[in-house]
Amino acid sequence: MKINEKIQEDEKKQSDVLKKYGRKDRHFRQRIICAVILLVLSAFFMILSALIPDFAEWYSEHVYPVWVSTLGRFSGLFPFSLSEILIYFLLLVFVASLIRLIVSVIRICRKRGRSGERTGEERESETPSPAALAASWLSRVLLVVGILAFLYTVFCGINYHRHSFSEEEGIVTYQYSVEELKKICIWLTEEVNSRVGNVLRDENGIMKLEAPEADGAVEAMETLAKEFSALQGYYPRPKSLLISEVLSYQNLSGIYLPFTVEANYNGDMTAYNIPFTACHELSHLRGFMQEEEANFIAFLACLSSDRSDFQYSGYLSGWVYCMNALYRADYNAWQEVRVTLTEEAEPDLAANNAFWDSYRGTISETAERINDTYLKANGQAEGVQSYNRMVDLIVAYFS
């Protein structure tokens, strides 16, 4: 009985301390309530869009474009990625606040140890308990998580459940033969060979971009939108990350950061990848989140561009994806096509392989597994392999 009374007494003291500290931290309850509301709303909209695709389609066509033309337009005023800066800032604040919490808890424990002659009530009335400090800190973290989850949902998550681009434009994929795939690969090889001499190259024979790639990507997407109405709308300029190594170590060529509605790409990678990647990320700003469709849209956008470097980027990127598919389907057929690629394109492929190989390791493998899980959680059953499904769309569209 005495033990139970002691436990109840301790719980009462902790509750009293939290109440006392709660008067000092007046916004504790408000933070918890706001965080819970935001998390519940996020879950509600994600479930609703998954159960009712027509809601997701309506949202993508009528609500999401408002965010792109307002917040996306605002963030586009800055030459750097606002989301990148925001993420670095939040990480810095998180680490600093955690260190401050730990230091404060240690100081309180030491202070109470030195003032052992005072009564418990006297000590608790002077300073909050470590539990109260931790609760206050966690409430702030929870609020930030709630805000980010809600922003992710309204600026990205719902779009995962909209109708696909192929459905919107009546492109029907089918089970094609190896011969059909081989014909596409031959066509792409011929296109690469005919354009390889039209791009600028450095002393090592590696492609260089002609002009700022961001403007070229916007122009390419706007040109393609004249043919496909689902792509019409405002496009902010895509941006290279200030620290592109963050993406390199994750084996990522680009990323759509929904918190500020920005398309970002890896500025360190081989130049031929950049136009294709910039258009890929911009396609997400039209609400098409499926990776294979973003790849296909980027492919079409590069082909529709007036710039030689964009055309070359599109054809060579499409060539890589389709040739990889042919390699898996029929090695002999792959060999027949592979030897017809001009030697002038080889430096680009070699530089690309060398670049990604230099970052291959535990970090990139872990990041790829995380990305795979993320894509599967958002309805892309094949995970990171879904990027390769653009081949199905290319064959269906051009055969």
Residue ranges of each PLM-predicted region?
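Post-HExxH zinc-binding segment in Zn-dependent metallohydrolases
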Residues: 289-333
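Membrane-interfacial, low-structure loops and terminal tails that flank and connect transmembrane helices
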Residues: 2-3, 7-27, 104-135
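Auxiliary, metal-adjacent structural segments of Zn-dependent hydrolase domains
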Residues: 199-267, 271
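Membrane-interface segments at or immediately adjacent to transmembrane helices
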Residues: 157-229
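Transmembrane alpha-helices and immediately adjacent membrane-cytoplasm interface residues
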Residues: 87, 94-100, 132-166
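Membrane-embedded alpha-helical segments of integral membrane proteins
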Residues: 41-108
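Active-site recognition of the HExxH zinc-binding catalytic motif
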Residues: 79, 276-288, 292-295, 299-300
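Pan-zinc metallopeptidase signature
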Residues: 344-399
